[in-house]
């Protein structure tokens, strides 16, 4: 059975672990516990063939900047995550996450993933953002950044409601199996 390695990166507390747990178990975790490193595996059928989708969760916190890239070798696709209600996490996509994965894995495709979309219209969240003269990141703005950074695609989801959740992983699988404008199956190698 062929394995697809998918590594999830992004700032701490943007919902990377919730995304993975909600997708793999259909349950939303009740408390926040920062991740050091975790992995999950699910079997998916693609064109009648079974594949193992290996999902690698990483720590977003700066303390792990030197440790995190150790999970990058042989990656088939990255999910670069930010919270649509945390504008700083969106800025870090350009400032930190895409440069980091591009440095270690320049040929590996990635998707830009906007998380926590259920909070985009939440009155309490909108009020909190407004106090800081901020607003949620719109779909258009996410798509524009994805195009600028040459992501395969921009996708959004809510791990809480599962809206768009399956689509994130379907698109990741497609990107891994058919990387656009590149030779097939360029994997990340760290020398």
From Swiss-Prot:
SMART domains: RAB, RAS, RHO. Expressed in the intestine and seam cells. It is found in: Cell membrane; Recycling endosome; Cytoplasm. GO terms for biological process: actin filament organization; cell division; endocytosis; epithelial tube morphogenesis; establishment of cell polarity; establishment of mitotic spindle localization; establishment of mitotic spindle orientation; establishment or maintenance of cell polarity. The keyword ATP-binding does not apply. A motif (Effector region) lies at residues 32-40. Residues 189-191 form a propeptide. The modification Cysteine methyl ester is found at residue 188. CDD domains: Cdc42. GTP binds at residues 10-17, 57-61, 115-118. Changing residue 12 to V: In a cwn-1 mutant background results in ALM polarity defects. A lipid is attached at residue 188 (S-geranylgeranyl cysteine). Its main location: membrane. GO terms for cellular component: cell cortex; centrosome; cytoplasm; cytosol; membrane; perinuclear region of cytoplasm; plasma membrane; recycling endosome. It holds the Pfam family Ras. The GTP-bound, but not the GDP-bound, form binds to the p21-activated kinase (pak-1). Interaction with par-6 required for activation of the par-3/par-6/pkc-3 complex. Interacts with toca-1 and toca-2. May interact with unc-89 (via DH and PH domains); the interaction does not stimulate GTPase activity in vitro. The GTP-bound form, and to a lesser extent, the GDP-bound form, interacts with serine/threonine-protein kinase mrck-1 (via the CRIB domain); the interaction is direct and may play a role in the recruitment of mrck-1 to the apical membrane. Plays an essential role in spindle orientation and organizing cellular and embryonic polarity by controlling the localization and activity of PAR (partitioning-defective) proteins. Required for maintaining the asymmetric cortical localization of the anterior complex proteins par-3 and par-6, the posterior cortical protein par-2, and pkc-3. Involved in hypodermal cell fusion, together with pak-1 and ced-10, leading to embryonic body elongation, which involves dramatic cytoskeletal reorganization. Belongs to the small GTPase superfamily. Rho family. CDC42 subfamily. This is Cell division control protein 42 homolog. The gene is cdc-42.
């Amino acid at each position: 059975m062929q394995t697809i390695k998918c590594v999830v990166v992004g700032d701490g507390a943007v919902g990377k672990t919730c995304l993975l747990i909600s997708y793999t178990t259909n349950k939303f975790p009740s408390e926040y516990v920062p991740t050091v490193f975790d992995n999950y595996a699910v079997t998916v059928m693609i064109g009648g063939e079974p594949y193992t989708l290996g999902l690698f969760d990483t720590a977003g916190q700066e303390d792990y900047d030197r440790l995190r890239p150790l999970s990058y070798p042989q990656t088939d696709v990255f999910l670069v995550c930010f919270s649509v209600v945390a504008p700083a996490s969106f800025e870090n996509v350009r400032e930190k996450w895409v440069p980091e994965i591009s440095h270690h894995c320049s040929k590996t495709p990635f998707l830009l993933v906007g998380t926590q979309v259920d909070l985009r219209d939440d009155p309490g969240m909108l009020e909190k953002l407004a106090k800081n003269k901020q607003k949620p990141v719109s779909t258009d703005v996410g798509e524009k950044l994805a195009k600028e950074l040459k992501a395969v695609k921009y996708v959004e989801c809510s791990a809480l409601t599962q809206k768009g959740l399956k689509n994130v992983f379907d698109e990741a699988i497609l990107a891994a199996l058919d990387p656009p404008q590149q030779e097939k199956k360029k994997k990340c190698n760290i020398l």
